[in-house]
């Protein structure tokens, strides 16, 4: 798991729930001696253990937490990688280019050992996208949250038209992006 996600999870938890909740979550996950640095890679179980602990502390469902975090994390990530994102993009352009521009150029080139999910996006009709998430991790709801976060960042909203678990680590969403009212 890329440290940038883990570091932002800490910021998300402290922003939404407070420092004491983060301290409790980190303790329950058994990671009190680990400071997640954005440029490092960590075992996948770190995120899973933190989310499981957060679920226990908040009483919220894992999928809801992942989706909320996905939406929350997009603005800081876009700001972090702003130089790689053309200013003229909207949410559709961002999502259509996320695999090549973000996962390939930013993550895999800088960290060849990194194994981010593969996120293939294609436009089925104007402003209707099929988003296919492929990963050995069960984090597809984090990806869906990111779709919501991208839309919100660009002043748009998302309507989920379809959601299906294809097999194992593959999940497909069909979404419509619309300007926010």
Give each language-model segment a name.
Residues 17, 29, 58, 151-154:
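A broad structural signal for alpha-helix termini and local helix breaks/kinks
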Residues 21-57:
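Long amphipathic alpha-helical segments
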Residues 113-132, 137-139, 152, 156-181:
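Short terminal or interdomain "cap/linker" segment that borders an active site or interface and mediates
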Residues 3, 140-141:
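Loop/helix-junction capping segments adjacent to catalytic residues or to phosphate/diphosphate-binding pockets
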Residues 1-33:
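Charged, compositionally biased N-terminal leader segments and the immediate start
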Residues 47-139:
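Amphipathic interaction/junction segments at domain boundaries or subunit interfaces
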